[in-house]
Amino acid sequence: MAKMLKFGEDARRSMQIGVDKLADTVKVTLGPKGRNVVLDKKFGAPLITNDGVSIAREIELEDPYENMGAQLVKEVATKTNDVAGDGTTTATLLAQAIIREGLKNVTAGANPILIRTGIKMAVDKAVEEIQKISKQVDGKEDIARVAAISAADEEVGKLIADAMEKVGNEGVITIEESKSMGTELDVVEGMQFDRGYVSPYMATDTEKMEAVLENPYILITDKKISNIQEILPVLEQIVQSGKKLLIIAEDIEGEAMATLVVNKLRGTFTCVAVKAPGFGDRRKEMLQDIATLTGGTVIAEELGRELKDVTIDMLGTADSVKVSKENTVIVNGKGDSNAIKERINQIKAQIEETSSEFDKEKLQERLAKLAGGVAVIKVGAATETELKEKKLRIEDALAATKAAVEEGIVAGGGTAYVNVINEVAKLTSDVADTQIGINIIVKSLEEPVRQIATNAGVEGSVIIEKVKNSEPGIGYDALHGEYINMIKGGIVDPTKVTRSALQNAASVASTFLTTEAAVADIPAKETPMPGAPGMGMDGMY
């Protein structure tokens, strides 16, 4: 297929138009007085949201060069969302600022490769300084503040803090839609591991692409199942009992998987298969954890057990199991409570004995899954549109809270970026174009405060100067229009979110500046519809 080409300044400017279109749409949502964006949906009601990554994902531009620019910045939002779960609007805004300042200098003749070196130096220094001013999360109150700022709702903050208190920092918190108007917290004991179904055809809810099994049997084995004959005796017993089955195995493939999928599609029998979590010896231990929790037996060769000999009383059971593409949650396993306590004490003893930090971390995870549980936040609202918007905000708040527990918190409202400007500005380079790269980051670090102020209807430059000349930690509270100590006032951002947003924005933006040519498909011309043929009655009146 023939291609269109653009070079140099022409290519970069076309792509920058796309960057600006996407970033200008996203950045109106930043801060406590940020607005919402309405997204048209092919099916159902429009979605109203202020979630940066949800907005970015919806944007496709007609012009291929503009679209390239938009897709590059979309990657900034997506990557930040994947790493930190929040901060996508800030990341998009920073990328736009770095690209804008960078292009001015590249157009004036600066070398983009040297500019990129300067950008990297400045970002590394900024991240180092952000980590220095970071404060560890201290108790329930700090958690509530982080969540409340992210969701712009104090009630949500309290709810997430309660959830984390009940299941622990390593516990599992899921968000579901409620059938009532209110938002409430429901804590159920359960275990989650990061393995999803082996085939999407096993999903029972095709809209959410999840498989939900109520009161199922659970077959736990470290073997690979490829021949259906191996598990046929126990399958026949389960079909007669009318229950569903979850298989946790090393792998399930070939004829065995095909048979299970076909039976599921025909409605004969519902079975979901997932791969066993972990690797090596850790996998054996995790399978034993699941067996203890559900009251089942691990079918393993080293224990002298074969699949063909499995009977129903060797299977585990639970109130419910939810399996998505990536995760499995077992809720209310029917294992013996004394056996579970014994297993928990065993893991605690191993934690005390081990000297390896990695092993300790993995043991803590296992302990949380056995002893913690699953907290479910049920989101309610008057309309479906409000419900979806609220759910997105709570998802962001939960991700922000987890990030805060991981790496700590810094002053919010863009204040942390302004606080590190002086240290970053001290960086110098003998190479003029590298120094330009450093200066670009120094200027771009002001952008989040400027945009929060603009969205609140005040002049950003005035706010930035005031914050720069104040003590570190003093920032602008856009909601109340006053200067306060941000951490004491509860306006905080997770360090991980603040750091990731800057790193991802700089990574994509500095690569963007080195672009010298752009190649795109020539749009296909629409062929006009042929005219209707004559009726064979020419000349008649």
Swiss-Prot record:
GO biological process: protein refolding
Keywords assigned: ATP-binding, Chaperone, Cytoplasm, Isomerase, Nucleotide-binding
Reactions the enzyme catalyzes: ATP + H2O + a folded polypeptide = ADP + phosphate + an unfolded polypeptide
Enzyme class: isomerase
Coiled-coil segments: none
Any single Gene Ontology cellular-component annotation: cytoplasm
InterPro entries (alphabetical): Chaperonin_Cpn60_CS, Cpn60/GroEL, Cpn60/GroEL/TCP-1, GroEL-like_apical_dom_sf, GROEL-like_equatorial_sf, TCP-1-like_intermed_sf
Family: Belongs to the chaperonin (HSP60) family.
Name of this protein: Chaperonin GroEL
Native organism: Clostridium beijerinckii (strain ATCC 51743 / NCIMB 8052) (Clostridium acetobutylicum)
